[in-house]
Amino acid sequence: MSNKPQSKRGTVTRHTHPQRSFVKRVYVAVLLVLLPLLMSLFSVLSKRARNETQYLRSGFTLKIAITGWNRTKTVRCSSKSWISDKKATPTLTIGFRDLDYAFDVFSGSITLQDALAARYFTTHGPNDKGVAVTYLFNVILKTFFGWRKSYRR
């Protein structure tokens, strides 16, 4: 047995400094508010995002939830845009295990695929729709965070 201290990474119940936690909450909250606008904008500007939006089709509803935090975001795909719709029943739910994990993904410090492999979040819904949402999010995240090490592969 090694006497090396175990890494705290991956521990869901870890605590962060209160000020950093506040900044993370604000950052993630702002991105959740902007999510329908960003998804609509990229569905117009990016051919790949447009193809994924067309694949998902009108009526598809995505819900993003973060365990331990009372904010969720539900967006519905209409013919050419994404709109916020709290009352819609989600087709696919992405559930982050905690705020730190959501922040890591939304700040570009880890890719969506790596976060899924590390179980930062779970998905509930049809796999084909989950893959399409992953591609759509990758277009958005890579545009903003292409300069980050995790997206320079």
Regions found by a protein language model. Name each.
Residues M1-R153:
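Feature captures hydrophobic
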